[in-house]
């Protein structure tokens, strides 16, 4: 699907009509309201929740149409396996690197040193729910959950990996049938237009959702709660910033594009993630923009939904950094062997808890429960600020998946470099999400 807007028309668009400006203003208004009128702010949570539900409602159709039509158009079905294999290699490499970065930074900065907190004085009940959910997760259970019990159930539940699983199988079956399936493929391609137009309509509510979510966050937790653990928050934000601009920036430069240009290209989606703390809210927009930036639909459809479960750079940085913070704060010594064990467990548990609400915190609980040296009760120290850290996790995860999509597309020879340069340089009308704010009149 292509939604075109000429550069000339876009140049005349008033600033206030751009989605990123509206969302940014809404975030600022939400912070002010939540700070000065916290009681009112906490009552606005339904606005953020309703918007996220609206977007989640459309995620399954977007993934299905993108993946099924993309694979159906492939003449070489072996390419599906190659794309998936290359994506998983990339995900494993950079997820591990993110875990190592968090571990190294925690050892160098030591954000929890000097706190001298007795684990026995902490309220373990506060994190009991997360620990219980963590014990329910396993690698086997996670893999089995990818296969839905019914065809309709995957779409009804909105499980991304289940929908992706069905979409891949259906796309392969369409490709095998060949010409006889062309009417079905044509129908699905035609259905793509109204589905993405619906996404455009839903995105008009993004400022309202961001306003409600931010007002609730500040109203409930307060800006003052940040000051108590400012060292940990600052370390995590700075580490994530450096990971994006140095590590991912180097990957981008090696593959022929600029990380700054990419961030500028997806700024509307990033602000949406910031306002809602949910990367899922921007998934349809990211898939659309990556396709318009020159990545083939088949690659976009496979890499992005899979990356939402397996390519969580921000979450991985958070896990090892937070685990060592708890150890330092509670004066729990960790040998190099303990830290290597922590790293290995985190590599597995980060996959077992993928796709779960509050996955970052639950994954941390799962990791600590297997590494006996670090007290799980220590998670109570960061429970109050986790909401503020989740925004940075989501943003880092989001940028990581955008970079991964372009890189895998280039590896597979499914990237139009000229179209990518035009999109990131703003020289061509390849953006789809601006249509969210300014539909053709």
Swiss-Prot record:
Stimuli inducing this protein: By succinate, fumarate, and malate.
Membrane-spanning intervals of the chain: 31-49, 69-87, 100-118, 150-168, 172-190, 210-228, 242-260, 282-300, 321-339, 351-369, 379-398, 406-424
Keywords: Cell inner membrane, Cell membrane, Membrane, Plasmid, Symport, Transmembrane, Transmembrane helix, Transport
GO MF, one example: fumarate transmembrane transporter activity
GO biological process, alphabetically ordered: L-aspartate transmembrane transport
NCBIfam families linked to this entry: PRK01663.1, PRK13027.1
Recorded family membership: Belongs to the dicarboxylate/amino acid:cation symporter (DAACS) (TC 2.A.23) family.
Entry protein name: C4-dicarboxylate transport protein
Species whose genome carries this gene: Rhizobium meliloti (strain 1021)
